Amino acid sequence: MPTVFPDDSVGLVSPQTLHFNEPLELTSGKSLAEYDLVIETYGELNATQSNAVLICHALSGHHHAAGYHSVDERKPGWWDSCIGPGKPIDTRKFFVVALNNLGGCNGSSGPASINPATGKVYGADFPMVTVEDWVHSQARLADRLGIRQWAAVVGGSLGGMQALQWTISYPERVRHCLCIASAPKLSAQNIAFNEVARQAILSDPEFLGGYFQEQGVIPKRGLKLARMVGHITYLSDDAMGAKFGRVLKTEKLNYDLHSVEFQVESYLRYQGEEFSTRFDANTYLLMTKALDYFDPAAAHGDDLVRTLEGVEADFCLMSFTTDWRFSPARSREIVDALIAAKKNVSYLEIDAPQGHDAFLMPIPRYLQAFSGYMNRISV
């Protein structure tokens, strides 16, 4: 834990909760009569409101993207390597907004929050929200903050999908889009992985149809398995081999069906256990479904070029060589469509062994390229 924060840290930060009374119509046909969004901001909004950057989070992300909530906090925000003075998203230049999306479980309205109409936890009654719904709620957030146009909307993985959707839904409100380790839609394999994770949760006896909180229980077993499956897909084979290989946790093989004998087994169990103590099962179901549903070209005859013809932003896409969850080929689909639509786009495929999670890591070539693009943005 830090006693003195590094010079390139945003330091101590405090989340804010913003309440919205105007009903939000959702893609599903349902609506939220009112809702909360929890945000953090870093840096200062300039006089012309031209330096604002929106950070969109991935599946298990949230509003705490940088800095520390207290001097006792063990780790900084989830993207601290990229946000702060002198970092790619330089808070001396930019006013940065990070939020917890609707349906999340870190303070924004979601399945784990109280339904104001009933006074009870939403649970399974919280309506399905999509990437488009998130973007519409984020646009209202921008209005509340007095931001007419984002200098950039930035995100990795599911966050990159939101950044892309911003340029489609609100083309005049985004000058730059940074879409990292993402895709224009999920492959069948990705949907399959999500379904296995969901079934792990749904088959947990303590899930109770999504109303487990009313009974004071948590479907930890299902959440743990879901996270273990997901975590495997976030790492590359090379990264897992280098980190664990076939190293034993025990001195020798026990030839026992129930023993945790390999280091990689122990690691996955730890990751699953830790995740199950901090994440909501209904939120996990919702987030994976939002991933599955994302397909902006579907409304344009499955033609991604047509879908992107109306965008006005400049684009930067980055992918990682060993990412097999969202492979470089998926980013190139977006790049090729943007080129065909005669849009400005930069693309970099970064050689990195870490797999999909590379977008979260302080890889020098990645940070250098990220900084290079952000430095070009005028405010």
From Swiss-Prot:
Site described as Important for acyl-CoA specificity, located at 325
> Which keywords fit this entry according to its UniProt record?
Acyltransferase, Amino-acid biosynthesis, Cytoplasm, Methionine biosynthesis, Transferase
Q: What is its main location?
A: cytoplasm
Instruction: Provide the GO biological process annotations.
Output: methionine biosynthetic process
Give the main EC class. Answer: transferase
SUPFAM superfamilies linked to this entry: alpha/beta-Hydrolases
Q: Which InterPro entries match?
A: AB_hydrolase_1, AB_hydrolase_fold, HAT_MetX-like
Q: Where does substrate bind?
A: 227, 357
Q: Name one GO molecular function term.
A: homoserine O-acetyltransferase activity
Paired cysteines (S-S): none
Which ranges carry the AB hydrolase-1 domain? 51-360
A Gene Ontology cellular-component term: cytoplasm
Q: Where are the transmembrane segments?
A: none
Give the pathway listed in the UniProt entry for this protein: Amino-acid biosynthesis; L-methionine biosynthesis via de novo pathway; O-succinyl-L-homoserine from L-homoserine: step 1/1
Catalytic activity entry: L-homoserine + succinyl-CoA = O-succinyl-L-homoserine + CoA
Explain the consequences of disrupting this gene.
Answer: Methionine auxotroph. Defect is complemented by expression of the E.coli metA gene.
Q: Which residues are responsible for catalysis?
A: 157, 323, 356
Known regulation of activity = Requires MetW for activity.
Family per similarity comment: Belongs to the AB hydrolase superfamily. MetX family.
Which purpose does this protein serve, as stated in its record?
Answer: Transfers a succinyl group from succinyl-CoA to L-homoserine, forming succinyl-L-homoserine.
* Complex formation: Homodimer.
Q: What is the recorded name of this protein?
A: Homoserine O-succinyltransferase
**Per the UniProt entry, what species is this protein from, by scientific name?**
Pseudomonas aeruginosa (strain ATCC 15692 / DSM 22644 / CIP 104116 / JCM 14847 / LMG 12228 / 1C / PRS 101 / PAO1)
State the taxonomy lineage. Bacteria, Pseudomonadati, Pseudomonadota, Gammaproteobacteria, Pseudomonadales
